[in-house]
Amino acid sequence: MTQAILELNGIEKAFPGVKALDGACLNVYPGKVMALMGENGAGKSTLMKSLTGIYAMDAGEIRYEGKAVNFNGPKHSQESGISIIHQELNLIPELTIAENIFLGREKTNAFGGIKWSEMYKDADALLKRLNVKHHSRQLLGELSLGEQQMVEIAKALSFKSKVIIMDEPTDALTDTETESLFKVINELRDEGCGIVYISHRLKEIFEICDDITVLRDGKFIGERVVADIDEDTLIEMMVGRRLDEQYPRIDVQHGEKSLELFDVSGPGVHNVSFSLDRGEILGISGLMGAGRTELMKIIYGALPMTCGAIKLNNKMINPISPRDGLANGIAYISEDRKGDGLVLGLSVKENMSICSLDQLSKGIQLDHHAEVTAVEDFIRLFNIKTPTRDQIIGNLSGGNQQKVAIAKGLMTRPKVLILDEPTRGVDVGAKKEIYQLINQFKAEGMSIILVSSEMPEVLGMSDRILVMHEGRISGEFMAKDADQEKLLACAVGKTVEQNVEVTA
């Protein structure tokens, strides 16, 4: 068997109240893609931070190119040939693409001046390799989130590293961008680069990876060859049990209409009409840029409605701010939980109650007892894994952060719950828990809009599905009559025969 270029053996790391790593192991082989799998909180990110010197490990050994090493920080590991593409962007919007790629490593002449033309040329070559249709002189802030992620990847490639760690690299990418990334990964593999690929998207793991390492509760569970394992076995290794049904949809008798839109238009949205019943899950499908998030923000009041009308519980509303949306009984859980949904420097309690302070106050005084009681109730209900309600939320796993974001919306006691990519970056075990919670809200008569780029999720959880294309509704289906081919056809603007049951 090929000798590993990078070996992590018996790594241990503890934080107050929790042992994050307990004998974790990982081998990275030259010319191979190693998937690093595990539920949120399994220790994947902690292991990578221990490798690159962000965290000092408590025990264990790291060997790189056959020698024991102990990196004292990301700069040290990067200079040694190990690059990491973080899930959170580490870029500056006010700088150009080229400046971001070569920040701190600018090419200079004998007099200390920057060789701009050479730097732009090298940056353009990296962008071309990733099929990014922008010039490196363009400001980064003008790019979409997915395009910025491609710049982050270009930055990692610029180091010409021997090992590249990719943490959820396709999380914000379109299908086309993902294809471009996979093409580059295959090229890097052929060049002998060792790649660590961290993702919750099982389809990607089986498509692009050679081997799989699984962590659970900070422990090393096993290393397998991708060709020798199936999804069910992999999931069982990750969660320690078999998941009987991935999408536990329930049938609930729908109530009267709760939300109606009439020819609503706004930024990126054109003449959209639909209705939503109580006890119904309405799925919204479509490609990135189709206007799904923009439509949700118009309903919530985060974007302006330029024409049309919205009726909530038979009353016309015109939300012009998120405060209006909350006052009307609409809760919106953003697709960007770290940018819009949560304040990472605040505690679990503060994040969960931040939108419900009016309901939790007596006059002008916050009722701290009521706040603590409500927060503790949701921590138990959602099975949120946190040492205490006062834990800084940025220290929680992605799945637990997402549960807090959903709980924050539910504490406002909404009539309509909008979930925009609720399971993005969430592991299979936490997904199942979120689906069960969604079903519980549905059974209680709540109206739910589920926006998701994962077609199996939309098909598996929704009662009815709308498809958007270029800001318009391009298709409507009862979930039982839909499939991925129909949704994708509508998503790209093709005409598809649609079967929709009309409710009175």
Curated annotation (Swiss-Prot):
Topological relation to the membrane, as annotated: Peripheral membrane protein
InterPro entries to which the protein is assigned, alphabetical: AAA+_ATPase, ABC_carbohydrate_import_ATPase, ABC_transporter-like_ATP-bd, ABC_transporter-like_CS, P-loop_NTPase
Classification via Pfam families: ABC_tran
Keyword entries, A-Z: ATP-binding, Cell inner membrane, Cell membrane, Membrane, Nucleotide-binding, Repeat, Sugar transport, Translocase, Transport
Enzyme class (EC, first level): translocase
E.C. numbers: 7.5.2.7
Complex and partners: The complex is composed of an ATP-binding protein (RbsA), two transmembrane proteins (RbsC) and a solute-binding protein (RbsB).
Biological function: Part of the ABC transporter complex RbsABC involved in ribose import. Responsible for energy coupling to the transport system.
Name of protein: Ribose import ATP-binding protein RbsA
Lineage: Bacteria, Pseudomonadati, Pseudomonadota, Gammaproteobacteria, Vibrionales
Underlying gene: rbsA
